Amino acid sequence: MKPYYRPALFLLLISLSNASYSDPYKIAFGSCLDQDIPQPIWSTIQRDEVNAFIFLGDNVYGDDDSSGELDTLRAAYSKQRSKLPSWLSEKEIYSIWDDHDYGENDGGSLYKGKRESQELFLNFWKIPNNDQRHDQEGIYFDHEFTTDGVKVHLIALDTRYFRSELDGGFRSYKINDDDGATILGNDQWSWLNNVIKKDADLIILMTSIQLLATNHAYEKWSLFPNERKKMLKLIDNLDTTTIVLSGDRHRAGIYKYNNVYEITASALNKPSSRKSSNETDPLLLHEMYVKENYGLMLIDGINKEVKFSLKDIGGNLINTETIQIK
């Protein structure tokens, strides 16, 4: 009888061997991609053989004046369409906007062109006509998928459409702690409180502006402390491993609050004009990086861990962290 079992045993061992070496699911992510500047970073990202790419905002630079005329934004999208590499069309793409693809620098709920801007955004990213984003105000959404037994829940926030007006001038914004001041707005908060309850092993939360950073002079969640406190409480109460992705800053960094990590990946091709990387923050883990960069996340279902890294334009490692999936 033994000869009959040996082939089956051999095939079983081969199967187990292949399973143990299953490739992690790879997600690259980044922000701040100017259509008028060369984009050499794409060839580097292609070498990582990613499964998906997340655009975290400022995916074009098409600011118009506050009148809501969108000629500049339309032209920016048209030019960017010819700049994005063809291989991206073979990957899963997830995108949110920030101010420069919203249409107004640091713009919020009062921007007159926001409805038409949303239509331009959805059409550019080829969002299917039956997608809820065509019927709602704002571009927030969620998406679920499973890789190697890990249930991943992607939650994408809109930090522009409903956001209250900023208090103060550019680079001198003041804290807005009014009870009614908001970033997400009532409808989006209600939606978030529902979808975040979905069964998942890993939550990836996309926000165009930084959630954890507090020290710099630019836009951030901490300008609206009540909103930030509400978000951190929501995340803190989760039993699910949660990672926050953000952009906007034209510099990159990794932050940690309790058990929550935030990775800011910015910029893909428009790095900070302020070359110093000396920015500090109580939640910042490493020195910030001010040249072109992108983020890379590896979801390893075999070992139940997530590895996320910041990489430079040549694909060299800047910083990396690894966390276990609960």
Regions found by a protein language model. Name each.
Residues 1-8:
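Bacterial N-terminal signal peptides that target proteins for export
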Residues 14-17:
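N-terminal signal peptide c-region/cleavage motif recognized by signal peptidases
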Residues 21-326:
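Metal-dependent phosphoester/phosphodiester hydrolase catalytic core
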